Amino acid sequence: MALVIIGRTAGEDRDNVDAEGAYQLSKREIDMIEKVTSFFEKTAVLFNIGSIIDLSHPCLQACQAQMIVWQGGMVGGYGVADVLTGRVSPCGHLTDTIAKKIEDYPSSPYFGGEDKNFYVEDIYVGYRYFETVAKEEVLYPFGYGLSYTTFRDTCIDFPFVRISDARFRCR
């Protein structure tokens, strides 16, 4: 299996724009993905990004897996390696809705360049808009995830601890 890693710099005061190498894949990235998928039977693309990116480009359809790893910081690679090697299951759920194309986001015509905000979605911001108005425009819905799991909380008993005149019992 081949791994292709696509990265973007985005974050506070540095959002993506609808341009090649930002929201859109660059020509070099498209060329790289096409070459890798032509030489390898299986290809996975990892997106090290801080905001959404166009995941609908045809070159990505030839890839067997895509994973948004977001920006995990200097130790985020350890978690990605654990997922890739099967040590842990990628049981998280998507915290955003990813539309098929940027035009599907109602706020996209008003993004950037203005010194004011236009809240054209009214109360239907983010996933609420897509669940209410445009379900057919969703590529990956809010809450989407590869696997689901259950968690169990257990209580651990601790002995009494005397601190001054106070007594605490922890469970």
Where are the predicted features?
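C-terminal non-catalytic regions of proteins with extracellular/luminal or membrane-system context
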Residues: 1-171
